[in-house]
Amino acid sequence: MNEAAARVLVLFGPTAVGKTAVSLEVARRLGAARCAGAARLARAEVISADSRAFFRGLDVVTDKPTHEERERVPHHLIDCVPIDGTYDAMSFRADVERLVPEIVERGRVPLIVGGGTLYLGALLRGLFEGPGSDAALRATLADRSLEEIYKELCDVDPQAAASIHPNDRLRIERALEVYRLSGRPISAWQAEAVPSPFRFVVTGLERERAEHRRAIAERVRWMIENGLVEEFERLRAAGLTPDCQAYRTIGIPEAAAYVSGNITLEELQVRIANRTWQLARRQSAWFRQEKHVRWVDVTGRDAASVARDIIELWSRTSEGER
């Protein structure tokens, strides 16, 4: 198979916008769709680009697709990293470049679904061969305030600082890490990024602000009612510590504070909802910078109707169009 000719359907959007339900409908309906009288389209296989679904055990807190849903539609890159492990954008891209040809060879459509901007960026904007991670340097940066490290980034790489949200600690730390280890700003590395060998048909989901906030509040209530605190306690016993990459997942530090008696159940719910909304806004801002996106408004709609729109976009897209 010629990898350069492989088309990949990408479905992204901020957290709690409804990506999982829509992706399952897209995968199901692709099996029955016909493209302008052409041959029957293959069913999709989902490649997760959810930056926390990679980790085994983060089930409730990430609202992963259920085992039943994963049996109906094949999923990849879910539960592929131990709870105390690490996973980066380079590993993600390598996995995607391995999986896409395999999925296409099976006669199915590769469907990348998620909101992890770091990982999606490695695919859509290209990946650069910069320096690796340095644990000691990361620990030093972690001890400094967010305001301090963002100011440093503004000084050493204003171009990168302009493209990174001031509250996005992970990306700020990575930009400073690259600069300190290589002596070059990350924006210079990014200008040399290697493009993906695939052709992407990119669809983005958006939702009216008030409805989106209600959806986030409902998800947080569901998480707490379905065992968020118990999940945290199990993971802590299994080796999850504040030093772990998975510990940064929204809901985990808050659950730790609740278990320690530092916040009430009501405060737990409010804190998670507020952090989730802040994340959704940052993700939306990042997605809006991406070119060649077909936007689909999901406000007041069910997953089936949204999926029909996405399949129509996919079907209309010519082989040579990104």
Pin down the residues of each PLM region.
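Phosphate/pyrophosphate-binding catalytic cores of soluble transferases and nucleic-acid-acting enzymes
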Residues: 1-322
